[in-house]
Design a protein with these regions (language model features):
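Glycine-rich loop at the start of a catalytic domain that most often binds anionic cofactors/ligands
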Residues: 1-7
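Generic, ordered loop/turn and secondary-structure boundary motif
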Residues: 4, 48, 72-73, 107-112, ...
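Conserved beta-loop-beta/alpha segment of the NTase-like Rossmann-fold superfamily
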Residues: 9-14, 22-111, 154
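A short, aromatic/hydrophobic, helix- or strand-capping loop or linear motif
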Residues: 12-16, 163-166
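Catalytic-core segments of class I nucleotidyltransferases/pyrophosphorylases
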Residues: 64, 78, 82-83, 115-175
Length: 175
């Protein structure tokens, strides 16, 4: 619920009338709304809490999670992620390269075995200081995660800001 009261959402809704890309996004959301489940938090309590609220909708071994406040206009981002998941049978997290000085705004990944479009994650840090960041690859609100992350989240201690962070649960699964 808090997202709908957010100034950002109101600005996007206003911009939608003028912006062709946003019009397309809202049109697609409307088209798929019977397949998409929106779950609301009454107050911000972290991405982990949001996932726990979705528990009853998660039927498969893995699920695709899209954060509503991260708009990705790149064509087929989720489709590419699903394709990679089908090939690897593993989790997939969308990333973008950010400036080192801005890493404290993001969940940041450490990795190994980098190829052109993918890498194996070996570390996740939620909003690190620039000198503590393992890279400058930031998580951008698209995940394919295993359903077993629910049990990790359920038993997880609260992280930065007193919230339940999905990044902390991912870190546990990596170990």
């Amino acid at each position: 619920k808090y997202f709908y009261n957010d100034v950002f959402y109101k600005k996007i809704k206003k911009k939608k009338k003028k912006d062709k890309n946003l019009k397309k996004i809202f049109k697609k959301i409307k088209m798929y709304q019977k397949m998409i489940k929106f779950v609301y938090q009454n107050q911000p309590d972290g991405t982990g809490d949001a996932v726990l609220k979705c528990k009853k909708y998660l039927k498969d071994k893995h699920f695709l999670m899209l954060l509503a406040d991260d708009l990705i206009v790149k064509k087929n981002c989720s489709k590419e992620m699903i394709s990679l998941h089908k090939r690897t049978k593993g989790s997939v997290i969308a990333t973008k390269k950010v400036e080192r000085k801005t890493v404290s705004r993001w969940g940041i990944l450490g990795f190994k075995n980098k190829t052109k479009n993918s890498f194996s994650i070996n570390e996740v840090i939620e909003k690190p200081k620039p000198n503590e960041a393992p890279s400058n690859y930031a998580i951008i609100g698209r995940y394919i995660l295993p359903k077993k992350i629910l049990s990790v989240l359920k038993n997880q201690k609260r992280g930065k800001g007193g919230e339940i962070h999905i990044t902390d649960a991912i870190k546990t699964l990596i170990k």
